[in-house]
Amino acid sequence: MTQTDDMDIAASSGLSIPDLAAHLMRTAPTEELQPPVTLGIRPVPPLARSGIERLRQAINAVSESLGPPTLYGGSAVGPTIRWRAPSHTVILDSPDAAEGGLQLSVRRTEALELSEADRFRHATGLDTADLPFLWQWQPIPTAPPPPSVPVAHDWTSLRASLEALLRAWCEQLEGQLGQDDACFDIVVDTEGKPRRLVVLVSPADSLTVLVDDRDGADSDDHHAEMTGRGWQDFIPLHRWWGAYFERTSAGAAAAAELIGTELRARGAQTPHDLRLADVGAGEGHGLLTLPALGIAPALPR
């Protein structure tokens, strides 16, 4: 019995998911303009982990025919995983986060990437719901990274994009990357004193935010100031502060609020004073991009 038979996976097309994936890639020139095919997975996994297990099963099923994904990622709506070839790309995504359903489609690679690049370049107001994805990870970098949206024009926009990304990671990472972490640093460089804030989402643990406070005063007043802003834990050896949040929508919102508050307290006047650095996932291999965050990348050294 094959893995797919054992999982009893079917699709609305009447084909098994591996057969459907192979069919879409084989007949891509005639299928590339067709609407996505809704997938059905039976039996439905237990409710608490149904979304994660359903996604893993679907990824494994498509991989039987097309090999492992070339691009992992997710939008504000749900996961978007891709099997990219030079001519066409098969896409596994979710049309509705509330429903948790999955669908499979194929699109011409060049047209898809040009269209998405245009959407990122011309994004206004950083409405993350209108963007094709918020994060994308290539285990083996083969595709050109997408352009980033313009820098957030104010703190409200940046907070919204941070919250959307962190919420997506809290919901999507485990189903795609297992127990691997994803992280990035935000650097504030004012008065020639770069200050670094680290954001980490771990499927095995929590949503963690750390800030370098080595130039902070060693006093009760400063300690009270930091805890008043929302920091929970001082690490004396390294002189960093940490705050830890549940991997939920509420946790993502609280973390985004703390990040914005701390960046302003560290001297940033606008999001243009920030730089994005050390973006990575897992053991650091591959390429993780965050095109919808609204923070300029770090300048080359």
Language-model region placement:
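Short, low-complexity cationic-aromatic patches
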Residues: G51-R54, T248-A255
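Short helix/turn-capping signatures at newly exposed starts of structured segments
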Residues: M1-R195, L200-T208, D212-R214, D218-H223, ...
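Well-ordered alpha/beta subsegment
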Residues: I235-A250
